[in-house]
Amino acid sequence: MIKLLYPEFWQKRNIIAYLLLPISVIYKFLGYLRASLARPIMLPAKVICVGNCSVGGTGKTQIVMYLAKLLKSRNVSFVIVTKAYGSNLKSATTIHQGHTALEVGDEGVILAKYGAVIATKNIKEIVPLLNELKPDIIIVDDFLQNPYFHKDFTIVSVDSQRLFGNGFLIPAGPLRQYPNKALDAADLIFLVSSHQDKIPNILTPYVNKLINAQIVPSNNIDKTKNYFAFSGIGNPERFFATLKNYGLNITGYKIFPDHYNYLQADLENLYSLAKEHNATLVTTRKDHVKFNDLNNNIVCLDVELSINHPDLLNEKIFKKA
């Protein structure tokens, strides 16, 4: 996992991007070698894989949450599999209420509120746990480039602002893989944070499987206060934009690397910054689960997915899955 901020050259090519291209060529070769040598296994239930082509937040977690609520409403049993980013997890584990973000990852702690979740760093380790849980559907979060298991249904999430960045592979660009192959193979494509009717040119060939989606607040926050925002997620700019669109007065902000594990010194610094700005701290749910915020000193903005074509999603999911 790349633990750094999204650099500017990932969005717009400059000399640094071109200097890093030789390493991107090696990355591409290693990915090809990995895929060619892989012997994918069949998991013991139908698999819905949610992923993206690039590094950084594209709304995958919100898509998984939406799917979990949808399956639950249809009384379909499911298990969510998450990668346990930023955790010290050693082997596949079924998440329970007492687990912390450091043990199983921030996404795992959040998703466990929606159903059974297995955290793992090795997809093959989940099979015994799946055999115990016996789900009808397995929702796999962020294993799109993993060639070691069969996928029955794939959803590719695309951020409407960043799209595919500068078009280069890691580390010269943000891409985990070139998008065309993933988009061709996808059953559905979610264009996230899109409030525009115009479809980006690169996605026009896929309009028949394209869903526009917005990340919208799902809880109430006092709009009369000042707020100092911070986050350690893949796309902090979208979080800050959501806060402003919600009508909050943001007096300052601080960005941490994706899946950042906060230290006590970080927390003390944040409280100091908030005091300087005469503001209350506000952050994301992914960040908030990492704090022992017993006194509710940090406001958390919860978000959910709103989509324009729920019928298309229902039709494709339940027809194929």
Curated annotation (Swiss-Prot):
Gene Ontology MF: a single term: tetraacyldisaccharide 4'-kinase activity
Catalytic activity: a lipid A disaccharide + ATP = a lipid IVA + ADP + H(+)
Uppermost EC category: transferase
Entry similarity comment: Belongs to the LpxK family.
Enzyme Commission number(s): 2.7.1.130
InterPro entries: LpxK (IPR003758), P-loop_NTPase (IPR027417)
Function of the molecule: Transfers the gamma-phosphate of ATP to the 4'-position of a tetraacyldisaccharide 1-phosphate intermediate (termed DS-1-P) to form tetraacyldisaccharide 1,4'-bis-phosphate (lipid IVA).
Binding site for ATP: S54, V55, G56, G57, T58, G59, K60, T61
One Gene Ontology biological process: lipid A biosynthetic process
Gene Ontology CC terms, in alphabetical order: plasma membrane
The name this protein goes by in its record: Tetraacyldisaccharide 4'-kinase
Cross-referenced NCBIfam families: lpxK (TIGR00682)
Metabolic or biological pathway, per its Swiss-Prot or TrEMBL entry: Glycolipid biosynthesis; lipid IV(A) biosynthesis; lipid IV(A) from (3R)-3-hydroxytetradecanoyl-[acyl-carrier-protein] and UDP-N-acetyl-alpha-D-glucosamine: step 6/6
Keywords for the protein's UniProt record, in alphabetical order: ATP-binding, Kinase, Lipid A biosynthesis, Lipid biosynthesis, Lipid metabolism, Nucleotide-binding, Transferase
